[in-house]
A protein has these predicted regions:
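Glycine-rich phosphate/pyrophosphate-binding beta-alpha loops
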Residues: 2, 99-103, 170-176, 192-206, ...
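Helix-loop-beta segment of a Rossmann-like dinucleotide-binding subdomain
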Residues: 1-16, 37-38, 128-137, 190-198
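Mid-domain catalytic core of redox enzymes
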Residues: 66, 80-122, 143-144, 151, ...
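Glycine/proline-enriched, intrinsically flexible loops and inter-domain linkers
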Residues: 224-225, 231-622
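C-terminal catalytic lobe of FAD-dependent flavoproteins
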Residues: 99, 108, 132, 136-272
């Protein structure tokens, strides 16, 4: 019972010294610079070092007033309550029927019936704001929904047909862009935490959520991998009314819909388009959305590029096979524009990077360093490449989904003043990977790409079409290749050059599915799946990217020093299934158990079908 639970929690909290002020209206979040200072209320000002925003559906507009992005929005939500039913047991589990979007539970001797609408309606859509006095507000009951709800309930719970309905309810409930919670410290204000966006399961999650946020505040980080709940997984555009209102009409129903592998959300699309989006579409690209960008997932050869979801064979396998094999044996084009791009410069830039990064950052123009950023416990907070563009000027490249998270981690841990600039939208990035990439680039741009002139992990500017273009000899698939960073306005000029010559070389346009398979074959790791804040570099096979020889200390060094000579508790390895199954039989994704002598010894982190080895492969900690 939510009411009894809330009362008991408040009583227990008061016994521990917590002060609760009722009928206390928030007027303003107080901050000094980008750090929290307190809250101003109608009962006075409370000065404090930390604030946790737990305002439910009001959280977005409270955050907005303080300059903080909180991506949630309320939709109309329905339930009804029957009359008393004397044969109803007092303790019953919550009943869910995903096929009909229906749920039911015991409620004081009555039956409560609700529905997670497959096509939800926004609340307050005219104003985009929740009224301050709407705590117990209701909407006019939609008779069509109520009739449908009653009919569905009667089919699953026949006794409902003979019970009178005492209460019909329609009210607001807030939802997030991906149906996950919003927790942790915000990127905009230091020590301003959030705990909201529970998508209708806040009561059941309250104990664990409160404990987790409290530990997060005390330690400044969490050793658990909570990125899927961290508010910093989102960017500013995710909380814009244009995005959030449309997206939450879909995510509400998705809670009860089939959770298909590789499912792409359909709402709030085309937020960020690649410079050559139309060209890729003509080439057969099937797009998915990542960090707001429409990214080519695969390229259809002769059919309409759309997903047909399945727990077996995937309809994009044939395209991915062609893309993988042609890239391994010849040449593949990959769009990498959504890569996050930060630039750090100033006299303290190198010193600060040495403190932030576990590896020894090269301070030589054109040199690149693969490294991780750690938390004080030695867990991996970020996976990145740092390139020295010139003295005291560096560019950081990291995964698209980690933009807000990594930016926050860097700025929060800087000890000295530097210039930090997010240049993600200023440059596109094209990956040309495969054994013929050197030959292709030489014919296209000139004799700049020989082994001697362009060693591995080096970068340099070339003047192409009256523009400075940065070429970097790196590849996320373990083949010869270059990443090409182009000023966004010049991208189409260079893309046309690549496209024209690509016909001669049988260049394959390749999507994210192929990239994932190719990197997995070479045991290249993906942050958020294979490495997280729960994993340290030693167990992840990344000890080569940790430098204990550099003079500077770095975040997490003390923790690593304590464990570097101790036996590993687990280790990341690449596995393949012994038998050569057909693609999709079985379909491996992630979190599959690894057995030894009939005992589970680990779980996979990334899995896919390798068309080079013709078998299922996976990365797993054992």
């Amino acid at each position: 019972d939510p009411e009894i639970l809330t009362k008991n929690i408040s009583i227990a909290a008061k016994k521990k010294g917590v002060k609760i002020f009722e009928k206390c209206k928030l007027k303003k979040i107080l901050k000094r610079g980008n750090q929290i200072r307190g809250v101003k209320t109608n009962l006075g000002t409370i000065n404090c070092e930390y604030v946790v925003l737990c305002a439910g559906m009001w959280s977005r507009q409270i955050g907005e007033a303080a300059g903080v992005s909180i991506p949630l929005y309320p939709n109309e939500h329905f339930y009804m309550i029957t009359e008393n039913y004397r044969n109803l047991p007092k303790i019953l589990p919550t009943f869910r029927d995903p096929d009909t979007y229906l749920y039911a539970r015991e409620y004081h001797g009555k039956i409560m019936l609700g529905i997670f609408e497959p096509n939800a309606k926004n609340a307050f859509k005219d104003t985009g704001k929740v009224p301050n006095n709407f705590s117990f507000g209701e909407f006019k009951v939609n008779k069509k929904y109520i009739k449908m709800l009653h009919q569905l309930a009667a089919k699953r719970i026949p006794v409902v047909k003979d019970l009178k309905i005492e209460k019909y309810f329609s009210g607001p409930e807030s939802f997030t862009p991906d149906s996950n919670f919003l927790m942790g410290e915000t990127q905009e204000i230091k020590n301003f935490y959030v705990c909201c966006g529970f998508n209708s399961i806040g009561i059941g999650s309250s104990g664990g959520a409160g404990k987790t946020v409290a530990e997060w505040m005390i330690r400044g980080h969490t050793d658990q991998d909570l990125f899927s709940l961290d508010v910093k997984r989102f960017e500013k555009f995710n909380s814009s009314l244009r995005f959030i209102k449309e997206r939450t009409t879909e995510t509400l129903g998705n809670l009860f819909k089939m959770h298909w592998p590789y499912k792409q959300l359909e709402t709030s699309r085309n937020i960020k388009l690649l410079p050559y989006h139309k060209e890729l579409k003509k080439l057969g690209a099937c797009f998915g959305q990542m960090a707001g960008y429409e990214r080519p997932m695969w390229f259809s050869k002769n059919k309409k590029p759309s997903y047909k979801y399945s727990y077996g064979y995937q309809n994009w396998y044939q395209s991915a096979k062609s893309e993988c094999l042609n890239t391994r044996n010849n040449l593949g084009f990959f769009d990498l524009t959504p890569f996050v791009k930060f630039e750090i410069s100033g006299k303290n830039a190198h010193e600060q990077l040495q403190y932030l990064c576990a590896n020894n950052i090269k301070h030589i123009e054109g040199r690149s360093t693969y490294t991780q950023m750690l938390n004080p416990s030695g867990g991996i907070e970020a996976d990145l490449t740092v390139s020295c563009l010139k003295k005291n000027h560096f560019r950081i490249i990291c995964p698209a989904l980690a933009r807000s998270h990594n930016k926050s981690h860097i700025l929060k841990n800087l000890k000295k003043k530097i210039k930090f600039e997010d240049v993600t939208e200023k440059y596109s990035c094209i990956g040309l990977f495969g054994p013929n990439s050197r030959k292709f680039l030489t014919e296209l741009f000139g004799n700049f790409f020989s082994k001697e002139d362009f060693p591995f992990s080096r970068g340099k500017y070339l003047d192409i079409s009256n523009s400075k273009v940065w070429f970097q000899r790196l590849s996320f698939i373990g083949e010869l290749g270059w990443e090409i960073y182009i000023p966004i306005k010049k991208t189409n000029i260079i893309f046309k050059k690549i496209k024209n010559l690509g016909k001669k070389f049988n260049l394959s346009y390749s999507g994210m599915h192929a990239l994932d398979i190719l990197r997995l074959e070479k045991k290249f790791l993906h942050w958020g799946h294979d490495i997280t804040s729960e994993n340290n570099p030693f167990e992840s096979g990344l000890a080569f990217a940790v430098s204990f020889k550099k003079n500077e200390s770095f975040i997490g060094r003390d923790a690593l020093e304590k464990i570097k000579n101790k036996p590993l508790k687990k280790k990341l390895e690449l596995f393949s299934l012994k038998n050569r199954f057909k693609p999709g039989k079985p379909l491996l994704l992630h979190d599959e158990p690894i057995y030894k002598d009939d005992k589970i010894v680990g779980y996979s982190t990334s899995s896919n079908y390798s068309f080079c080895y013709n078998k299922n492969i996976c990365l797993a900690y054992i």
